[in-house]
């Protein structure tokens, strides 16, 4: 081995978790011609919004009896309008097999709630000289337990929960999140990119904690010596720090 050859012990890469914004195209029926026309109309509203946008093709909501999807043809239609397919979401065997045949990643069917994505018409033409002053909104305070399946969002401010948060519950805030009870669900602070946001938990047993898109899941959190303790979570660079309160 030459002296210039790197040692095996020296890492050449690092795997990091990050929550990325990816458009999901949920196909309602198997009609590529109609899709081509409707996509053209949508893209015409804001071309740069869709240009080279990463895309997941969701085929798992297609009604029964729609027939076999021409997956390469579907991808060509999307690509012609600037959308780059990263993966498909599917449950039918034929769709999964078609994706595997062209080495396209397959995601499991989603149970999460997704909202329609609508570009702002004329957003490229109107560029304000300076960003508007942020609107300060009061802290959102929840006094009752947050049950599994519930989602609570504090838009423009902090979220305070003076009770427990069950597994499957989701807390979101543009600012900080405070939980004065067992935290067993998901807590996502600074969801619009505020890297100074923090999460405060009286008892950290969460499924996921996230600040400004950087996150740790329960498998990572359980290995932390402060699992189950009273902690705060902050972000330093792209690293989440867990500190005892």
Swiss-Prot record:
Keywords: Cell cycle, Cell division, Septation
Transmembrane segments: none
Region feature (Disordered): 113-138
Biased composition (Basic and acidic residues): 113-132
InterPro entries: CAP/MinC_C, MinC, MinC_C_sf, MinC_N, Septum_form_inhib_MinC_C
GO biological-process terms attached to the record: cell morphogenesis; division septum assembly; regulation of cell division; regulation of cell septum assembly
SUPFAM superfamilies: Cell-division inhibitor MinC, C-terminal domain
Family: Belongs to the MinC family.
Function of the molecule: Cell division inhibitor that blocks the formation of polar Z ring septums. Rapidly oscillates between the poles of the cell to destabilize FtsZ filaments that have formed before they mature into polar Z rings. Prevents FtsZ polymerization.
Subunit structure and binding partners: Interacts with MinD and FtsZ.
Name of this chain's protein: Probable septum site-determining protein MinC
Organism: Pseudomonas fluorescens (strain SBW25)
